């Protein structure tokens, strides 16, 4: 139900994103019964993919009040129901709410697009066979922290609108902490040993080529900054 698809080439170890309105279906059926039995790890990874869709769409330079409303709806559902869907896979309400979260996030990024996190995820996934949601999880917090000077207001607003409980006034840092807490709750990795030092220069070129060609990012990243984030992820 989104405008995007990705083609993986096992010979070149590349993933190519495709975007065309013809990919958008006339109708999508969200049946939570089909999700019962989905393993906890895949539930967690795909949930983080949906979270990444929503967050990247919210901070996109193409964001609108409509797309940001869809992003907020998705993020609120994910924070509340993803831990339950992971821990209690047979919970039909949690499965339904996560299906709706994925739907809302898809509506958001179809119109507002994505960002550096997906450029990292596509290329780490293609090179090393990492699951897409896991790769998004590796890149999401580092990219948000890199972009923070340009997106602090947006993340503060997300902290407020997603009802994060804090003793102080909600801040961008509170939103980042909420994501980190979600990672801990559902077992999402924050770093990987898969990245090879000899691959970093090539990965930087591929990541920046994809992001700068396709995505309306809030803060541009140069080669040195991209390499530092890859090293951080591989620590």
Regions found by a protein language model. Name each.
Residues 51-55, 98-106, 120, 140, ...:
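Short alpha-helical scaffolding segments that buttress acidic/His motifs in well-ordered protein cores
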Residues 36-38, 57-61, 85, 105, ...:
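Alpha-helix C-capping/helix-to-loop hinge sites
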Residues 69-73, 77, 97-100, 119-122, ...:
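Amphipathic alpha-helical interaction segments
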Residues 3-112, 218:
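Carboxylate- and glycine-rich phosphate/diphosphate-binding segment that chelates Mg2+/Mn2+
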Residues 155, 162-235:
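C-terminal charged capping/lid subdomain of soluble metabolic enzymes
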Residues 112-174, 180:
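C-terminal catalytic subdomain
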Residues 38-40, 62-67, 141-143, 163-167, ...:
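A ubiquitous short alpha-helical element
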